Amino acid sequence: MKSAALQLHNAANDNGLELPLSWARFGICVFPIAAETKLPLIKRWPEQATTDLAVIEAWARRFPGCAWGASTGDSVFAVDIDVPHASKPDAANGFATLASLQWQVPDTVTQVTMRGGMHALFRAPPRESGWYAKTQAGAAMPADWCAHYGVPAGYRLPGVDVRGSGGYVR
């Protein structure tokens, strides 16, 4: 993925096509979701998510004011770093968890979330490698990923979730 400095995106300030078009240009499949509920606005979104800029622009006209989902699965997975917020003031702070490990988000596609957390998107290893990212909360990261990024294998990361096969991030 490209430089995080060029791709940091604040979801709270996005109401247009900047986000989905930039994701698509980097090979991340996107689809429209309802801004309030984060629910997909198209049927069969896992199959319909696309990097086709013309399709994305057509969806923007069809669903004005929609938000956008980035599909995760075989080619891309996301690390979702949560923070405490008004509706969950006692939630774990994922940034604090990662800081306690002296771990920083590697150079990748990132986005500040609506509640002040972060989504960091990564290319998934080829399926034939045997590696598989599944969607899970309080993630125990895969051993090879942990080794590569310096996180203890099997460590549960409070406030850090993985979005993998069948998942998406907003």
What kind of region is each of these model predictions?
Residues 1-170:
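Conserved phosphate/metal-binding and DNA-contacting active-site motifs used
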